[in-house]
Curated annotation (Swiss-Prot):
A GO molecular-function annotation: rRNA (guanine-N7-)-methyltransferase activity
Gene3D superfamilies assigned: Vaccinia Virus protein VP39
Job description of the protein: Specifically methylates the N7 position of a guanine in 16S rRNA.
Descriptive protein name: Ribosomal RNA small subunit methyltransferase G
Record field: transmembrane: none
First-tier enzyme category under EC: transferase
Catalytic activity, EC: 2.1.1.-
A single Gene Ontology CC term: cytosol
Gene coding for it: rsmG
Family as reported in the entry's similarity comment: Belongs to the methyltransferase superfamily. RNA methyltransferase RsmG family.
Lineage, top ranks: Bacteria, Bacillati, Bacillota, Clostridia, Eubacteriales
PANTHER family for this protein: S-ADENOSYL-L-METHIONINE-DEPENDENT METHYLTRANSFERASES SUPERFAMILY PROTEIN (PTHR31760:SF0)
Length: 239
């Protein structure tokens, strides 16, 4: 129970219940990350305490954003090792979650995690966001889209906003210096039907990490031409 108090404190900070079951799920998840990271590249963060603080607690902080607490469905785009989708699912069992990633090896890992943690109402998709966002069963179908991926905000917005239904939210988990990104992305967010509603500064206790949650509300439907074809988005971000 070495890390129980650390995780419980983080949950208390965002008004979430925490118990032994959730703790054991987090520890099993940590162990799977460490085991699989020897086979495939999941994360450069591999020590116990660093995984707890720099991955898990960072993801828990997304609950500071009120839309997450009310959401019934969520898609995590470019989820990688399952961040933030798996921690969200552990803490909010009633939400339906889709994890999307372009690398099959990571999807294989995530399916193992889902089975080992006995998570329900969660699915994995292998492929590109640009393709799935044009499919009727995914386009404008989710209350929330989230991403912790490293792409700039203009690019992330075109990947993510098309998945969100009108009235829903895209939440981008960004680093400490986000002002220039926001300035550069404001026009693209507007084109895609979004509007920046809030920017929340996040501190991760006992670390030097300072992050921002960029909360974007979907105020209009996304035009049919977006997202554009694979490859174009990164080469030529909307301006």
């Amino acid at each position: 129970m070495e890390f129980f108090n650390i995780l419980q404190s983080a949950c208390n900070d965002v008004n979430l219940d925490f118990n032994d079951k959730k703790y054991n799920q987090f520890i099993s998840y940590k162990n799977l990350i460490q085991e699989w990271n020897k086979k495939i590249n999941l994360t450069a963060i591999v020590e116990d305490e660093e995984i707890i603080k720099k991955h898990f607690i960072d993801c828990i902080k997304i609950f500071k954003s009120s839309p997450i607490g009310e959401a019934k469905s969520l898609i995590d785009i470019g989820t990688g090792a399952g961040f933030p989708g798996i921690p969200i699912k552990i803490l909010k069992e009633d939400i339906e979650i889709t994890l999307l990633d372009s690398l099959q090896k990571r999807i294989n890992f995530l399916n193992i995690v889902i089975g080992e943690l006995q998570l329900k109402n969660i699915q994995c998709l292998h492929g590109r966001a640009e393709d799935y966002a044009q499919e009727i069963q995914h386009r404008q179908k989710y209350d929330i889209a989230v991403s912790r991926a490293v792409a700039n905000l203009a690019v992330l917005s075109e990947f993510c906003i098309p998945f969100v239904e009108k009235g829903g939210y895209f939440i981008a988990m960004k680093g400490p210096s986000v002002e220039e990104e926001i300035t550069a992305a404001t026009k693209s967010i507007e084109i895609l039907g979004g509007k920046i509603e809030d920017i929340m500064k996040i501190d991760i206790e006992d670390t030097d990490l300072k992050h921002n949650l960029v909360i974007i509300k979907k105020v209009r439907e996304t035009g049919k031409r977006y997202p554009r074809k694979p490859g174009i988005i990164k080469k030529n971000p909307l301006k």
